[in-house]
Regions:
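Acidic, serine/threonine-rich low-complexity regulatory regions at protein termini
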Residues: 1-215, 219-396
């Protein structure tokens, strides 16, 4: 059955459209792409402490922003030290989040670190791929950018497209992304492009065009992030030939014009990598946080949450589950993430709920992905099981 007709029930299931090996061979990933994540982390000394103060009202909510990594393939290249390594309304979440003046965060890029907080950028100064010399300025800019390009919560209200349809589409996109062996950044950027487009054009997008929007969003993201890009024919094949090449090109132009050719929104994975360095986490803890982040991509209730906040909350949940005997949110993590533990709690609880329902959810692409050896089988760990999560909820 064509994917276009299935969109009445939403998108095709991943298992129905597996890309054959001859197409996979055309979607190679250059060793440089894999090396991009190599040695992302090195062990740093334990980070300790800071808390910012100045609060400001944002919109009508008192919203918690203070101051201020691979996947299918690159998880195998992460090196830590010597070891290789769906939904209450989103508005309810946003109301519980307080924002700190971004200028306070900017000032930190030149500030002296508080006593006990390790300078992770100095430690990694010889790692050219980490751009340690410019890291504070880079992340200050990304924090400003995520506020500028923030997606509105509940943006599909009044549209034919629903949050459930969006979730099914993203579940399918995860499957296609995995089959093409694309970089993790490509998936997160694809979802960001999808949301930003639907935020503006959701009322003009029909069900039978939704999958086209999703696959073209991934095509655009691939052109930015990948070295070897799947062809349009390969993307068309992934939709069971529900669309043709001209439709793909027309939609690509429409999306780019709608977004005013601005594709510079930061993604949560970028922040997670920095926070993982600051928290001195191991590869399993980092992989669990990525699993939680990818589950949250499908949750319409979290679309209005800043990427940095999503990353911090996902890492908090991971540490809560895998390292319960140590302080979950260290002063160093608070300093480099810019979020206190209290600020994270609304999103943390939401993410724990996502983990609890993951096993019984009909949308299984993310869970199946993280049940594989390449991802350390974190989805199968007892800590990710509902029974264990229920016990840990009392500490969240």
């Amino acid at each position: 059955m064509k994917a276009r007709t299935i969109l009445g029930n939403l998108v095709n299931q991943a298992s129905q459209h597996v890309i054959p090996n001859n197409l996979k061979q055309g979607v190679m990933k250059n060793w440089l792409a894999s090396n991009k994540e190599k040695n992302t982390f090195k062990r740093s000394a334990t980070s300790e402490s800071l808390r910012t103060e100045k609060e400001l009202k944002r919109h009508k909510n008192d919203n918690c922003l203070k101051t201020p990594d691979a996947d299918v393939e690159e998880i195998e290249f992460i090196d830590i030290g010597a070891t290789n390594i769906q939904s209450p309304k989103a508005a309810l979440l946003v109301e519980e989040i307080h924002f700190i003046d971004i200028e306070d965060y900017d000032n930190k890029t030149n500030a002296v670190l508080p006593v006990g907080v390790t300078d992770i950028d100095t430690i990694h100064g010889d790692e050219q791929h980490l751009w340690s010399e410019y890291a504070p300025e880079i992340y200050a800019y990304l924090r400003q950018l995520e506020t500028t390009n923030q997606i509105k919560e509940d943006y599909l209200r009044g549209c034919i497209i629903t949050g459930q349809m969006r979730s099914r589409l993203i579940d399918w996109m995860v499957s296609v992304h995995l089959q093409f062996k694309l970089l993790p950044e490509t998936l997160f950027m694809s979802v960001n492009i999808l949301d930003r487009f639907l935020e503006q054009e959701g009322k003009n997008t029909s069900r039978d065009r939704l999958q086209l929007v999703g696959v073209v969003a991934m095509l655009i993201a691939s052109k930015i992030e990948e070295i070897y890009i799947p062809t349009i024919d390969e993307f068309v094949y992934s939709t069971d030939n529900a669309y043709n090449e001209e439709e793909v090109k027309d939609m690509e132009l429409k999306i780019m014009r709608t977004l005013d050719f601005n594709l510079t929104s930061p993604i949560s994975l970028t922040f997670l990598r920095r926070f993982s360095v600051a928290g001195n986490v191991d590869v399993v803890e980092h992989s669990m946080a990525k699993y939680i982040l990818e589950l949250s991509l499908m949750d319409y209730g979290l679309v209005g949450v800043h990427p940095s906040l999503s990353a911090a909350a996902a890492l908090h949940v991971s540490l809560l589950l895998l390292s319960p005997s140590v302080p979950v949110w260290s002063p160093g993590l608070e300093y480099y993430s810019g979020y206190s533990r209290e600020c994270l709690m609304p999103v943390v609880r939401r993410m724990i709920s996502l983990l609890e329902s993951a096993e019984d959810n009909r949308l299984q692409s993310v869970r199946n992905k993280y049940s594989s050896r390449k991802f350390r089988r974190v989805a199968l760990l007892k800590e990710a099981k509902k029974e264990f999560l229920t016990k840990r909820m009392q500490f969240a």
